[in-house]
Amino acid sequence: MVKNKKLTGNKIVGNIKLDIINIIDDILYEKKYSNIQLNYYFSKKNYTQKEKTFITSVVNTVIKNLIYIDYLIEKGTRNVKKRKIKQLLRVSTAQLFFMDSDNAGVIFEAGEVAKIINEHQVGFVNAALKTILKSKEKFDNEIPMDKREGIVLSYPQWLVNKLKIDYPDNYLEIMESYKKRSYLSVRFDKNKMTKEKFEKLLKEINTEVLFSVDEVYYLSNANIFDTEIYKNGDVVIQDASSYLAVKNLAVKDGEIVLDACAAPGGKSLAILQLFNPEKLISTDIHEHKVKLLDELKNKYGYGNFRVRLNDAAQIENLEVKFDKILLDMPCSGLGVLRKKPEKIYELTSNDIKTLKKLQKKIFESAYKCLKNGGEIVYSTCTFSKNENTNNIRYFLEKYEDLEILDLEIPENVEIIKDELGGAYISYKNKYMDGFYIAKLRKN
């Protein structure tokens, strides 16, 4: 398939809308992550902060509501053959029904952008949007009852069915929660500054603290990126959920530690800044990701930090026995849908099965390389029970010398404990990623 050319326009409104169309096209057809693609465009173009906010809002609104938006477009038009026209209809439909927009203005702008894409499609675009606007209630009533939840909330039907099995009492709340907005969170290095000093700096840059967990703060804006403490690495992007996985590793001075699926390195850095291991070995299976770990090592200069190219399912290749192992598993990523909403459309039920097998292989390899008395923290950024509770149950049954340990979770973090002692960072936490954490000791 020939890749579509990027669109360019002459008018300011046209330029922004065309950039939005190109970003969405990259996400849906070139399989780029939304947050990465947005940052890429923002680094290349001189947008104002207001424009960045608008672009981010439109892109996320389209992606998070894609199934429902496409349903409305399919009901309101004949088959849309032009890919960029389809993206334009998606953007405009999102504005009409999910954003505080002037309907007439949205349709007028769509016509102006259509002129740049293909002037022969202007009439089609205008007519399609007017039909959708006029007939939305009728189209809503035509959604089959057994598919309503999946279409309206934009979840694949197989996943809706799975959630009903895993969480029969609150699956709808979970679905709704992970369609909400995400928040910027950062962690400051407590070795470089106090909490009071960091909070004082936030006030100086007109940034409000929305929520915090220890050294992780959720912020009202991105002003922190312009500060020296961010540029020099004393403050890094990290979610409190992943921080808690590291915190529960509870490394003692002089211990040998493995971060088995380490890239891009945020958890490895947290281990080095929170604890004082004799040695931390961080590995990844992909060369380009190992380069990210090497860059982290070179930037911070920790003498006890080692980086290796290695398959996490073959940890024994390292020929090292570890006191502590962090297994932040490759997973379906359902807990980070607020930040990466596109993941839901790429995932299949077979992917969950494949991931579960891989997670078992990684754990079994880690178990072989864990010292007697050593501990593993198992974590994922998903709420899929097959990848979490069911795996931990399997490990406990297979290895009789394993015991599950209590977790240290701050009082302001709501969790859902499973029957084994593992913890899901609850969907009710407005700011935090969905995560699962379990801690096991080899006796």
Regions found by a protein language model. Name each.
Residues 1-443:
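S-adenosylmethionine
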